[in-house]
């Protein structure tokens, strides 16, 4: 036989592909079986020589799949080799992954526990072994395609006929042990500790074969290969002796399992040897896992599902969404707790193949981008969570605060927002705008609750520092530069630090913080508050290099030469927009941004005379309020918009009015007047309208209606624009319309692949909470970018939430009767000073305010999609989701050799159900 013929013969012996076994398909050089066997031979030729590669192929042809042989038995089948050479050849073939060895006696034919070699099945078996070889799969990348295809082709069109328990095919989900109810009649095989104790002393670990495979194929989902695959029993010893893994202790294995749960990875055990043996425990990520694909792609949960199903308690659930984000099956989504006018929403259950014809039209080919990525049911969920750009678990932390769980509330907030104290002072409060309670009386004082929670942490002896939660267990050593130390840049650094990086923030100013310290007055947010939250970032390993302007002091190219592999540009909009009218160059005219910078730096402590502020947004309010504190004269704001059109947060506008700022609506500056080079007044004209019929900014003026306002100072706060200097010099990154940096809307990647952008220079002028959201997305993209083979989009949670229909709900009477919204007290000693005069809520106010929450949202589990992994239970801090043992038949484990004995009867019963269902439908 030729080599190709030998490979084809061996491939047919091992394969589970029905079309090959039935003779419909041949094993040709482009067939996956051929690719796998040939890569093993090529690896052997490199490590040993061509003769050894040829010889191990001949030896393999004398073996039968999954029939173990001792060295004596192999010698009888291969008399052409002397004993010493045969032993060397068996070591070589074992290292190649085609053959495995063990000492077990499960078949009763090895009472003395002699070493025996076995020709493995492809999956699970030799394909994974070839992948975890530290050299082989990278040397011969076609190995990855072999693994991927052999985990797919034998199952396509078959999985719908597989009974509960998996029929000895592939892998089987085993739940998080602490999630198994104590009162359930669980079996020992449903507990990971049972298997680890059974094999204690023979436990090892290897890199994940699936993660490595997807990396090589360029389809990684950000779950970078690390040591996640635990080998047990003789397989662990085999891996150690062939350099496929190394030994670990029982305790180390338990630590890996805990880290896997922290990451949201699913525990699975091998399911091809019956109830008395497994050889591996995998910790699987749905974006890359071939085993989970067997149930998720084909929509046939029997291939994976454990005996358990998750159930959510609607009374306890607060729609934090953490279970949804990590559900590998997409079984949990956020819905609503409030009834509609027609009654409670009845959430649908996914169709199953038990009584339905199942073809590709029933598959979910997009499962990697749906499971854990689609957050809400079509009817929506809590409006506060949906409206927040960072999608903080608002309903959740309000519940915790009301129960006095302040530290837990802070931890929950910090999963999505690194700056709760900052946001507690200056947030845009999108959540309060959306709050369902606002349709009854007033929205919850959500921001005040968050501020209180953050202050408890700031007062604590030991601040909460979020722990690293790396997808590889270890820190990453890739160097990442954050250009700009504002909220977007620091948020990116924060989430990268959690992922295991040590990013470096380059900030051109003397201290980090961006507009938080330079553009917002201290009576709105104390600089000590900003510093305290930045200090937490330092403790997380973020480095700040201040007084360094990238593009001037050092270039991106120079940083690349220093080893930086990715850049996050978040330089904001640093220059104020101009009026472009006569007199703008007079002394006394200043941009609001420059004015606030000088005030915050302590360089400007007094103004003389009356002040006119031009602008109608929040920044203009800040400027006007700051000016009031520096002058004995009057402060008047003039803006284009009518009062109801002003782009201000109502609270901010009201605070300005309370301070004494006079707001004059529908006026536009025409010219600034002066004498001797100094401002003496300003001429304004009537603004008739601000936007045209399409909503585009197109102000219309009546120049015949004018007023002249005497003043000594004109502060212009009409917006900001970008000033990039040379930060992007020498790169392909470019601006759109000369303003914002062009980027992908999902990944925030610029036209230069290693440059990502965020904050105002990406989105235009927005708020701190918006910047935080873009910082998180930047971190997600950068992590994927700097790790080879990871895509920027596969299994990316785009964090899209839909709010419930507030026009179709029935509000709970007992909640509506709760007290009125708590008012924010004012410290009279701080009024019109540079200190924040707002008094933080008391604990009593917190409890009262939390009681007003209507608890709109909840998680809803589809039991037909749930695979019973229990990961959801590890993410819930409210005791709201639990596993129940409702599918005991799913714990039936049988040897792979008996799979057709299980599939046949089940398939026959299923066919009867399909016929009955079809007949019933025809009668209708």
Predicted regions and their residues:
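FAD-site-proximal beta/loop scaffold in flavoenzymes
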Residues: 585-608, 672, 692-765
């Amino acid at each position: 036989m030729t080599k190709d013929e030998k490979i084809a013969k061996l491939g047919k012996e091992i394969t589970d592909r029905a079309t090959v076994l039935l003779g419909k398909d041949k094993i040709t050089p482009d067939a996956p079986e051929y690719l796998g066997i040939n890569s093993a031979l090529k690896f052997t030729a490199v490590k040993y020589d061509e003769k050894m590669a040829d010889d191990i192929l001949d030896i393999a042809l004398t073996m039968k799949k999954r029939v173990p042989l001792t060295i004596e038995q192999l010698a009888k089948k291969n008399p052409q080799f002397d004993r010493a050479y045969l032993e060397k050849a068996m070591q070589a073939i074992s290292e190649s992954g085609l053959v495995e060895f063990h000492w077990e006696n499960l078949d009763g034919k090895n009472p003395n526990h002699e070493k025996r070699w076995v020709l493995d099945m492809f999956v699970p078996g030799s394909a994974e072994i070839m992948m975890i070889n530290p050299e082989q799969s990278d040397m011969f990348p076609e190995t990855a395609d072999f693994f991927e295809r052999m985990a797919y082709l034998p199952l396509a069109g078959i999985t719908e006929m597989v009974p509960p328990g998996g029929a000895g095919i592939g892998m089987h989900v085993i739940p998080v042990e602490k999630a198994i109810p104590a009162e359930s009649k669980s079996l020992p095989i449903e507990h990971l500790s049972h298997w680890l104790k059974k094999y204690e002393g023979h436990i090892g670990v290897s890199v994940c074969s699936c993660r490595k495979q997807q990396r090589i194929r360029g389809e990684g989902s950000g779950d970078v290969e690390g040591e996640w695959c635990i080998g047990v029993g003789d397989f662990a010893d085999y891996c150690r002796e062939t350099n496929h893994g190394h030994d670990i202790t029982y305790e180390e294995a338990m630590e890996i399992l805990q880290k896997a749960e922290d990451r949201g990875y699913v525990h699975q055990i091998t399911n091809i040897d019956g109830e008395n043996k497994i050889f591996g425990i995998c910790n699987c990520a749905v974006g890359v896992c071939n085993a989970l694909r067997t149930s998720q792609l084909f929509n046939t949960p029997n291939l994976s599902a454990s005996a358990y199903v998750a159930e959510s308690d609607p009374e306890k659930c607060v729609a934090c969404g953490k279970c949804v984000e990590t559900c590998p099956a997409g079984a949990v989504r956020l819905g609503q707790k409030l009834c509609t006018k027609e009654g409670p929403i009845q959430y649908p259950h996914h169709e199953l193949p038990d009584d339905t014809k199942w073809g590709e039209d029933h598959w979910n080919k997009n499962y990697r981008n749906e499971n854990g990525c689609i957050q809400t049911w079509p009817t929506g969920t809590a409006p506060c969570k949906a409206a927040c750009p960072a999608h903080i678990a608002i309903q959740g932390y309000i519940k915790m605060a009301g129960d006095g769980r302040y530290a837990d509330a802070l931890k929950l907030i910090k999963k999505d927002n690194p700056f709760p104290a900052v946001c507690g002072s200056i947030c845009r409060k999108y959540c309060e705008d959306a709050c369902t309670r606002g349709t009854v009386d007033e929205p919850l004082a959500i921001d005040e609750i968050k501020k209180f929670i953050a202050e408890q942490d700031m007062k604590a002896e030991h601040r909460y520092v979020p722990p690293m939660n790396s997808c590889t267990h270890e820190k990453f050593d890739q160097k990442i530069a954050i250009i700009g130390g504002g909220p977007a840049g620091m948020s990116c650094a924060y989430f990268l630090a959690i992922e295991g990086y040590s990013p470096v923030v380059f900030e051109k100013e003397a201290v980090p913080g961006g507009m938080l310290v330079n553009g917002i007055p201290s009576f709105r947010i104390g600089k000590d508050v900003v510093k305290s939250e930045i200090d937490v970032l330092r403790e997380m390993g973020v480095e700040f290099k201040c007084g360094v302007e990238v593009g001037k002091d050092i270039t991106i190219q120079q940083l690349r030469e220093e080893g930086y592999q990715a850049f996050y540009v978040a330089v904001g909009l640093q220059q104020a927009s101009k009026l472009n009218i006569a007199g703008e160059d007079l002394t006394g005219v200043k941009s609001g941004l420059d004015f606030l910078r000088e005030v915050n730096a302590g360089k400007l402590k007094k103004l003389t005379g009356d002040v006119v502020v031009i602008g109608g947004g929040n920044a203009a309010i800040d400027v006007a309020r700051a000016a009031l504190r520096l002058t004995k004269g009057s402060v008047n704001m003039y803006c284009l918009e009518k009062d109801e059109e002003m782009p201000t947060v109502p609270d901010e506008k009201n605070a300005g009015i309370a301070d004494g700022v006079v707001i004059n609506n529908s006026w536009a500056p025409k010219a600034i007047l002066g004498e001797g080079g100094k401002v003496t007044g300003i001429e304004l004209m009537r603004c008739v309208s601000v936007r045209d019929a399409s909503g585009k900014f197109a102000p219309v003026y009546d120049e015949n209606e004018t007023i002249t306002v005497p003043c000594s100072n004109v502060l212009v706060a009409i917006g900001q624009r970008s000033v990039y200097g040379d930060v992007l010099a020498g790169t392909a990154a470019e601006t759109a319309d000369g303003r914002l940096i062009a980027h992908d809307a999902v990944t925030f990647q610029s036209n230069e692949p290693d440059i990502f952008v965020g904050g105002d220079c990406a989105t235009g002028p927005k708020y701190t909470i918006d910047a935080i959201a873009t910082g998180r997305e930047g971190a997600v993209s950068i992590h994927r970018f700097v790790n080879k083979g990871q895509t920027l989009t596969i299994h990316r949670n785009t964090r899209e939430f839909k709010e419930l229909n507030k026009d179709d709900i029935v509000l709970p009477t007992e909640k509506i009767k709760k007290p009125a919204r708590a008012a924010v007290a004012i410290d009279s000693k701080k009024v019109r000073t540079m200190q924040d005069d707002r008094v933080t809520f008391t604990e009593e106010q917190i409890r009262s305010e939390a009681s007003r929450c209507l608890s709109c949202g909840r998680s809803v589990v589809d039991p037909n999609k749930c695979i019973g992994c229990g990961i959801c239970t590890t993410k819930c801090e409210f005791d709201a989701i639990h596993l129940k043992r409702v599918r005991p038949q799913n714990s039936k484990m049988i040897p792979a050799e008996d799979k057709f004995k299980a599939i046949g009867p089940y398939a026959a019963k299923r066919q009867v159900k399909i016929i009955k269902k079809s007949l019933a439908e025809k009668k209708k």
